[in-house]
Amino acid sequence: MENVQILLRQHVGAPCAAIVKAGDEVKKGTKIATPTGLGANIFSSVYGVVEEVLEDRIVIRPDEEQKDEFVPIEVEDENDKLALVKEAGIVGMGGAGFPTGIKLGINLAETEMAELDAEINPELPADFKLEHSYILINAAECEPGLEHNIRQIEEQSDKVVRGVKYCMEITHADKAIFAIKKKNNKAIEILRKAIANEAEISIHLLPDIYPMGEERAVVRECLGVNLTTMQLPSAARSVVVNLETAAKIAEAIDEKKPCITKNLTVRGKINGGNQAHVFMDVPVGVSVGELIERAGGIDGVYGEIIMGGAFTGKATELDAPITKTTGGILVTIEFPDLHGANVGLLVCACGGSEERMREIAQKMNGKVVSVCRCKQAIENKPGAPLKCLRPGNCPGQVKNNMQFKKDKCEYIIIGNCSDCSNTVMASGPKMGLKVFHQTDHVMRTVGHGLYRTLRVSKQVDQLPNGK
């Protein structure tokens, strides 16, 4: 095993402060960094010796022999489940990285329904209230090509359900709903059996479109409530918890295990084919290159390596370490060459940032001459990440396409969701605009359909009584 690099910022908030120094011996589960503000504890994921403590990371030289045992977390009251979650350093494992101990620190039984925005909830009465409070389990595995969440349901459904029940207990929620795409038949059947005797836990089936895993999309699909870009799920008396996060909660409470490993998918231009390689319980801090080698190694010349998913991931390097929020490592085919042609960028809250899209345009040898923003992309405050007004439901992109045409674009690169991409295609090609999606090189690599015209229904039949 190569040196393990454990970043000091693996969560929403400020970087943690190291509490170890070079030369210190550490074990799996040794606490090595603590929050300086909003954040979560960080632990060693291996047995070894601290080589360096840098400004942004702790470098550990692993021992040749790695034991399975770990140092258990300790709290004043072992019956305090929320304290165990906080001490374990658990964050949103789906990519957001918000500290779970803070997210679960709410009493949903005493949380009132917020006032809804009538403009985005025209079908609901002004005085609409939800009768129950909910834990919503995000099992959408939203990013195409990733498979580790579904694998965890198939192999560890009992652990996941235990974690969900702990979330309900901690927040005083009276119901829980699993949000999962209908296409995952095997996982759904396993989940149905796992919750058969759980009267307050049900399943909501999702269509296979992007971005069904966006937090507010999960609330909308499960509860029929549209939240504004400023509202949290608590406005709908709910907390959204990622599937893998729920499993980590069960580990913290049942085993006193700190958050030191990550499940992820390695896929793409890999020797042996483009099938998904799912790795469970990978030590946090292992390098991207080491995992690619475990999957078979890169097959020849490639375009880029992405950490995360095709939509929201970022280009990375072989020596970059994985974190608590890493979901995918994608090795792509080479980019097409646009030979300096004029390019327009359509930036969407559901996809990459403008910076990421400019990077893609540069790798395609395109000249960016126009940048438009999806009209549903809202910037809540200057510099904040964009949020979609109604994730997955798009009113149209004709105005933006007309601007691209006016700016003499030959190509446009879009980062839109399934529905927005569909509306781009309704007018863009008719105006002579050639369309690329920012995910095209990934989709072609993994054999997934391109995001253009929407060919699947946004409505799916549900299980009887959610069971």
Report the location of each language-model feature.
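Acidic, low-complexity mobile loops and tails
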Residues: M1-A18
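Generic structural motif
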Residues: Q10-A14, V26-G29, F43-E52
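Short hydrophobic beta/alpha edge segments that flank linear recognition/processing sites
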Residues: V26-A40, R57-I60
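Gly-rich Lys/Arg/Thr-decorated short loops/hinges at beta-loop-alpha junctions or inter-strand turns
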Residues: G92, I135-N149, I378-A384
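Hydrophobic alpha-helical positions that pack around
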Residues: A114, A118, D174-V288, R294-V301, ...
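Cofactor-cradling patches in redox/metallo enzymes
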Residues: N149-Q152, K183, C372-L463
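Histidine-anchored nucleotide/phosphate-binding helix
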Residues: E154-I170, E359-A361
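Redox- and metal-dependent alpha/beta enzyme cores, enriched for Fe-S-associated oxidoreductases
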Residues: N342-L389
